[in-house]
Amino acid sequence: MDCHLSILVLLGCCVLSCSGELSPQPSNEVNLLDSKTIQGELGWISYPSHGWEEISGVDEHYTPIRTYQVCNVMDHSQNNWLRTNWVPRNSAQKIYVELKFTLRDCNSIPLVLGTCKETFNLYYMESDDHGVKFREHQFTKIDTIAADESFTQMDLGDRILKLNTEIREVGPVNKKGFYLAFQDVGACVALVSVRVYFKKCPFTVKNLAMFPDTVPMDSQSLVEVRGSCVNNSKEEDPPRMYCSTEGEWLVPIGKCTCNAGYEERGFICQACRPGFYKASDGAAKCAKCPPHSSTQEDGSMNCRCENNYFRAEKDPPSMACARPPSAPRNVISNINETSVILDWSWPLDTGGRKDITFNIICKKCGWNVRQCEPCSPNVRFLPRQLGLTNTTVTVTDLLAHTNYTFEIDAVNGVSELSSPPRQYAAVSITTNQAAPSPVMTIKKDRTSRNSISLSWQEPEHPNGIILDYEVKYYQKQEQETSYTILRARGTNVTISSLKPDTTYVFQIRARTAAGYGTNSRKFEFETSPDSFSISGENSHVVMIAISAAVAIIVLTVVTYVLVGRFCGYHKSKHSAEEKRLHFGNGHLKLPGLRTYVDPHTYEDPTQAVHEFAKELDATNISIDKVVGAGEFGEVCSGRLKLPSKKEISVAIKTLKVGYTEKQRRDFLGEASIMGQFDHPNIIRLEGVVTKSKPEMIVTEYMENGSLDSFLRKHDAQFTVIQLVGMLRGIASGMKYLSDMGYVHRDLAARNILINSNLVCKVSDFGLSRVLEDDPEAAYTTRGGKIPIRWTSPEAMSYRKFTSASDVWSYGIVLWEVMSYGERPYSQMSNQDVIKAVDERYRLPPPMDCPAALYQLMLDCWQKDRNNRPKFEQIVSILDKLIRNPGSLKIITSAAARPSNLLLDQSNVDIATFHTTGDWLNGMRTAHCKEIFTGVEYSSCDTIAKISTDDMKKVGVTVVGPQKKIISTIKALETQSKNGPVPV
């Protein structure tokens, strides 16, 4: 450290000053001796007496200080000693000596080259007692001290001297104290100050742990120090630090954390303010009280709920206080005989919680609603009575013609803590006539080798007049894979044609006007052993009889297959009171033959849908969003994750709340239809949900939606080959349906779905119906909506639908595809379309439509349905076009495509017309002749100038004839210029 010393050497006195600023003493240094701080004389021992001399001066702050100097440079063999007083070492083991001094350059003193020195020696001696007599040999040399800078005569003249600072280590020291000694051997030196100190690691707080002053033990190792936690904190990991020999703290390990109700602020743990809390020990900060809670004092670990607000026992303190929800709203009941479906809306006020559930309280009431009692334990709730998470429940097994009141409680996690009354909504209903209860016992009366006679008691609760009983039986070993159903009017029956020595399983259920009751439990009975054997004398007779029977059966089956009269089951009358039906898996099927079964023939739609569709667990279905609304409810997109299978995207149709039984039957009917189809161009049914609400139909998800919307969105973006590929897929799907004997009735581009690979699939089977046994027979509808613009003339006129009428609709779909989703007959009303089609008007070819495709459209639009191609032929035609793309380059001529006009399939030669009447007859608009007779448009020349408004004035108001006449007029103009043009 360089400072400047201004000194006056006069009569042994000097004044010291320093032009530089002194650094403050570090906090980790503890002084044992500092000569500058001693008031008065230092009193150190100087030997010999004419050696070191104590003088007074002032420092840079003009504070008086005592210093020692010596300058015996003229004499040889100088040995001047200066010893300090005894210095206690306290706890130090290693001490540091800091010397500040000035030293005269020997070269600046004349005649002293042989005797002048520029160094002095530093010594020390340990001692347990002070007052020890000075003896040179007892001291141990620490070091020889030399000046970094010395002063000259010139410096003396300027009174500016340079101050040197040197620090030396001493130790380890073991005794209670020590002396320092300075030996001069002939230098001109002044000791400005002497400071003796040791280093310590000072008190500090680290990681909320306090570490005390610590003195290093030796010069080699670190001292491990255990910290103690500050107030209102506790150890998380034991806090430790290491004190180095340089008095520095190193390597903090572990820490303390503030207690609950306190947070770290600097080096302390401070209590949370009112309105804030901290629930647990740790480094977290105090948090503001959650809604509807507060604190009034410092250091709170949780917040108290406001009046009428609560926090459940397991709720974390950070959760807002809540209250019970309000009552459910908009309760709707849908009664079905002795069951009821209850639907309701969520409470307006959830109380601030999401864990809302619903409990159903059932009460059976007399005609006076106030006189009620709890319902019988036999009443069932689906999915359950308590803890419902959805807003619907089905209640079954109610008594017929009985009043019930249902109270729907809304509860959440704090409802049990609240004292206010229950929050519920109530609805009262009266049940209708119910199906009969099960037959409880079946008794075996007689048994033979091939028959069993059974009897049973009427159900305990018939709930009406028993119409008949259904007896279902099958061989036990077949496990219900093939069963027989027999109907009986009484409570007994004899089943014959059984196998000897065979166990059969029987179930019986009763039927009333309200429908079938549930099946009885299963009863097992065994026929008698077979004691009959074929002897030698009659074996040939038996073999002939068996052969004849087999031949008759085979012939009967073949006949049924050829005429298409096989209906899935065999009927035969056994008596006036019994009917027998035999099923294989519910329907008898022949290898290689797949026939569509109309689900509407089933009395119970649920039985039909379970026959053809897979029941899904609603928990495996997740709904993402609502994408539209259908006839029966919402249409959603979502995901289906079946066990051991990959999650797939699906479309979900739901049955709306408050449905009628007919709507439910139609809804499940559509699923029963789809479930019978398995073709890459038919929408695939993934399954149904009928055992929970809402009921759902789950199908594969088609990313691009309906074909018409998709084409409009991507107008003119596909090649002709791509469009033909789409059409080929639709035709292939329709061929599959036709082969199954199935009529769609609503084939349109809006009912074709397209996926991301541009694969088209037929969908929407809401209007579909089954064909009769004759493949060319028609199903006559009983009314309902018909899509006029897509429907064939015979279907519009006579309500008769066949596969040929589907071919007509396919022609319209073909037109929609080639026009990129335009609406057919877009400028015409439905009535105009019906009249125009009946008069043989047809849609014009779309822009740039290949002639081969337009010809296929016209073939599909033949008035005689027998002249239309079959779907098999359409698939073949499209395959040929795909294999020969050059044939698609021939575009329909402009002459055959008047702009925005319908095109008559008949070619009219205008040159053959001589009068207006001939012309109108040629266009099949003879009914307009009387209108034009007697008016100014009585000749071809005058009528060529007619406009649409002019036709309306004279009475031609139907759009079809209007457009036909205008089209022919344009052709007439072309004829007058270029010759005849076909129209």
UniProtKB/Swiss-Prot annotation:
Superkingdom of this protein's organism: Eukaryota
Domain named Protein kinase: residues: 621-882
EC code(s) of this entry: 2.7.10.1
Transmembrane segments: 541-564
All ranges on the Cytoplasmic side of the membrane: 565-983
Native source species: Mus musculus (Mouse)
Function: Receptor tyrosine kinase which binds promiscuously membrane-bound ephrin family ligands residing on adjacent cells, leading to contact-dependent bidirectional signaling into neighboring cells. The signaling pathway downstream of the receptor is referred to as forward signaling while the signaling pathway downstream of the ephrin ligand is referred to as reverse signaling. Highly promiscuous for ephrin-A ligands it binds preferentially EFNA5. Upon activation by EFNA5 regulates cell-cell adhesion, cytoskeletal organization and cell migration.
Keywords: ATP-binding, Cell membrane, Glycoprotein, Kinase, Membrane, Nucleotide-binding, Phosphoprotein, Receptor, Repeat, Secreted, Signal, Transferase, Transmembrane, Transmembrane helix, Tyrosine-protein kinase
Phosphotyrosine PTM positions: 596, 602, 701, 779, 937
Leader sequence segment: 1-20
Protein name: Ephrin type-A receptor 3
Catalytic site: 746
Phenotype caused by lack of the gene: Mice die perinatally due to cardiac failure.
Positions bound to ATP: 628-633, 653, 700-706, 750-751
SAM domain mapped to chain residues: 911-975
Keyword Transmembrane: yes
Any one GO molecular-function label of the UniProt entry: ephrin receptor activity
Keyword Transmembrane in annotation: yes
Residues in compartment: Extracellular: 21-540
InterPro entries the UniProt entry points to: Eph_TM, EphA3_rcpt_lig-bd, Ephrin_rcpt_lig-bd_dom, Ephrin_rcpt_TKs, FN3_dom, FN3_sf, Galactose-bd-like_sf, Growth_fac_rcpt_cys_sf
Catalytic reactions on record: L-tyrosyl-[protein] + ATP = O-phospho-L-tyrosyl-[protein] + ADP + H(+)
UniProt-annotated glycosylation sites, renumbered to this chain: 231, 336, 390, 403, 492
Tissue-by-tissue expression: Greatest levels of expression occurring in the brain, also detected in testis. Expressed in myogenic progenitor cells.
